[in-house]
Amino acid sequence: MFIGNYQHNIDPKGRLSIPSKLRSLIQDSVVLSRGLDGCLELRTNQEFENYANKFLSQSNNKQQNRNYKRLLFANSLTVEIDSANRILIPANFKKMANLSKEVVIIGMGDHIELWDINAYEQFNEANFDKFNELAESMDDDH
């Protein structure tokens, strides 16, 4: 399970090191995709397939379904992990999440989120004190 909060820098060539505690749970490649709330997401190939299958089973007759699938699959890419445990984040993906140099890497259980440090700090400031409230609202989903 992916857990923890790590801060790493994107190097001048666009590479980001994957923390060793997260790397041990990943094979030689991951799927990089557009995430929710302005971040990027990393999933193992198997987890991305599981995630994608939820949407593939939905009808293409609905415009909203087609639009989401287009945005998801067009903005997803398999990236290799190099011998130094780094992934290359293409320029268009960095732009998508407004990533500059400093990145916060968040374990989200079944996937990893990559956040621009400023965006993550804003999220954290807005939500940190709402932990109990958010936990209670999750009970409504079951």
Curated annotation (Swiss-Prot):
**Which GO biological process annotations does it have?**
negative regulation of DNA-templated transcription initiation
Q: Which GO terms describe its molecular function?
A: DNA-binding transcription factor activity; transcription cis-regulatory region binding
Its Gene Ontology cellular component terms are: cytoplasm; nucleoid
Tell me which domain of life the UniProt entry assigns to the organism this sequence originates from: Bacteria
> Mind telling me which Gene3D superfamilies this protein's record contains?
Transcriptional regulator MraZ domain (3.40.1550.20)
Entry keyword annotation includes DNA-binding: yes
- CDD domains tied to this protein: MraZ_C (cd16321), MraZ_N (cd16320)
For the keyword Cytoplasm, the answer is yes
Q: Which UniProt keywords apply?
A: Cytoplasm, DNA-binding, Repeat, Transcription, Transcription regulation
Cysteines engaged in disulfide bonds, as pairs: none
Specify where it is mainly localized.
cytoplasm
Cell location: Cytoplasm, Nucleoid
- Which residues does the UniProt record annotate as the domain SpoVT-AbrB? 5-47, 76-119
Quaternary structure and partners: Forms oligomers.
Tell me the protein family, please: Belongs to the MraZ family.
What's the protein name?
Transcriptional regulator MraZ
Q: Which organism is it from?
A: Mycoplasmoides gallisepticum (strain R(low / passage 15 / clone 2)) (Mycoplasma gallisepticum)
Q: Which gene encodes it?
A: mraZ
